[in-house]
Amino acid sequence: RGVDTDWLNEPLRFAVSQRHNLFIEGGDQTFRYGVGANIGKTQGVMKGSDRQTANGNIRLIYRKGQFSFTNNMNFDYTEADQESVAFSEFAKANPYMRKYDADGNVVKMLGYDYYENPIYSPMYNWSNNNINNSRTTGFTNNFEAEWRPMEELRARVKLGIRNTNSRGKIFKSP
């Protein structure tokens, strides 16, 4: 048929990332604090894939005499959308097959493989309402206490906890 279909060009895009940060700190010699937040969005090179992140943190430091106490808290959130059709499906598509029919509609089936199994167009699979996303929230708290009875000797205790919740959703239209 003389078709020279560039299947690899279809799912790709020029991706842009952005990130914004804010950090405020202050206090005196006894008590110091820091509060920060950042957000970001990263596009994937595959159309339909991206990642959004948000993070907040609080740092508190208390120093009095021989004692020092530090607490760091972090909250984070990530939402990610994955491409609904793998790039490998586009890479495997035959360049002699057409993407669209004579009416301009996406071709559903490209043909059959050696075992007579249907080969579906990645463009058709891509046009379905497929979903592949995930959300993750996390909390981290690190606490440290230090005692310095003399300059050459110190005792330190560190405690930390981490909690992460992830939820994903995958739906592929038949």
Annotate each language-model stretch with its function.
Residues 1-3, 44-49, 55-140, 156-174:
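Surface-exposed loop/interface segments of Gram-negative outer-membrane beta-barrel transport/assembly proteins
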Residues 153:
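An active-site-proximal structural segment forming one wall of the substrate-binding cleft
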Residues 1, 18-20, 26-28, 71, ...:
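Solvent-exposed, well-ordered amphipathic alpha-helical segments
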Residues 1-23, 33-46:
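Short strand-turn segments of transmembrane beta-barrel domains in outer membranes
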Residues 23-25, 36, 58-59, 142-144, ...:
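Outer-membrane beta-barrel architecture
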Residues 17, 28-29, 63-67, 148-150:
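Outer-membrane beta-barrel channels and translocator barrels
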